[in-house]
């Protein structure tokens, strides 16, 4: 699944005590001055993004981020029209501290009181020791609600940008909880494939960042795993007979497009240089998949097939569901 999110499983033993040298303070446990200061820094980065001030953001980033700023810059430029004139509100704040002298292979932080609405966990690979903050902002834009998660690191007494994650919180006008409820309804109706795909949509939308989790989210990951159809490429590629031809399917996942929620199918192809042949294969895959699983007609507005070479180069075709026959 594109952008696959990490499921963090919390065991009772780990919850009983914090990881050695790794502590977290949730917003409700912070003193007011610290919480306000972190929120103000996050708001400043949002304001710079709304102005398109990528130079200023880069200057106020840690060295690792400033030397690899291309992805953040592209996101800021793309979203500037949405953020210009918008207002941001702080939803949640977390202060993370990691002791030591070497990067931590898998730093684990447990924040807040377990069972409370503010409890959260973070699992961050290869984290250098230091003091960090995670601030999540809610933003109302002309294109709907967005969330901006800023990762801050204390550097020389100042909080600098160490991560920037900005994205919509809805697909086709619906949030993650809506997709979760739809997934459960599809499961109850015996539409296992639509159910699983809607679980994936919910899990794309619910966590602000892929290294954050909480107990209810862990339960949803469990639900999704149990709902995974055996004939889908969940644990590796699967071979399907589609439109009279055998195809090796690598990935199947939902995605929002301008036309609404679409189903994306990635399959293996030795060569896509013959675009006419690739187009024909794409249409075979699209039509064959819908014929194999008719329930998809009600679940998706369209289907995308992407013939993918071993190099990763691909050739894609989008077909509206009304045109799949």
Regions found by a protein language model. Give the residues of each.
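Surface-exposed, charged secondary-structure patches
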Residues: 70, 77-145, 173, 231-272
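TPR/TPR-like (Sel1-like) alpha-helical repeat modules
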Residues: 192-209
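Short, low-complexity N-terminal intrinsically disordered segments enriched in polar/charged residues
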Residues: 20-51, 165-178
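Short solvent-exposed beta->alpha transition segments
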Residues: 25-33, 39-40, 55-119, 205-232
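Short beta-strand edge/turn micro-motifs at domain boundaries
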Residues: 22, 134-174, 253-273, 284-323
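Positively charged n-region of N-terminal signal peptides that target proteins for export
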Residues: 1-5
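Bacterial N-terminal signal peptides
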Residues: 7-17
């Amino acid at each position: 699944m594109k952008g696959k999110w990490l499921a963090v499983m919390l065991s009772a033993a780990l919850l009983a005590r914090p990881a050695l040298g790794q502590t977290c303070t949730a917003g409700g446990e912070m003193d007011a001055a610290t919480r306000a200061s972190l929120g103000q820094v996050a708001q400043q980065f949002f304001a710079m993004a709304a102005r398109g001030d990528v130079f200023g953001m880069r200057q106020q980033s840690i060295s690792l981020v400033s030397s690899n700023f291309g992805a953040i810059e592209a996101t800021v430029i793309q979203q500037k029209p949405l953020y210009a004139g918008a207002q941001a509100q702080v939803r949640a704040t977390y202060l993370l501290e990691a002791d030591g002298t070497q990067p931590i292979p898998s730093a684990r932080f447990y924040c807040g009181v377990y069972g409370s609405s503010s409890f959260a966990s973070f699992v961050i690979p290869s984290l250098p020791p230091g003091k960090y903050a995670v601030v999540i902002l809610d933003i109302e834009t002309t294109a709907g609600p967005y969330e901006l998660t800023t990762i801050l690191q204390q550097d020389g007494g100042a909080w600098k940008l160490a991560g920037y994650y900005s994205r919509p919180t809805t697909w086709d006008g619906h949030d993650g909880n809506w997709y979760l409820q739809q997934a459960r309804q599809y499961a109850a109706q015996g539409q296992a494939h639509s159910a699983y795909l809607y679980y994936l949509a919910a899990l794309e939308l619910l966590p602000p960042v892929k290294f954050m989790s909480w107990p209810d989210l862990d339960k949803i990951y469990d639900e999704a795993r149990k709902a995974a159809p055996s004939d889908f490429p969940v644990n590796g590629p699967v071979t399907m007979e589609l439109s009279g031809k055998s195809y090796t399917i690598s990935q199947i996942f939902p995605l929002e497009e301008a036309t609404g929620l679409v189903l994306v199918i990635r399959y293996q192809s030795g060569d896509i240089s013959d675009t006419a042949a690739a187009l024909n294969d794409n249409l075979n895959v699209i039509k064959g998949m819908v014929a194999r699983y008719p329930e998809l007609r009600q679940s998706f507005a369209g289907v995308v097939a992407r013939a993918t070479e071993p190099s990763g180069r691909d050739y894609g075709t989008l077909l509206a569901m009304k045109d799949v026959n």
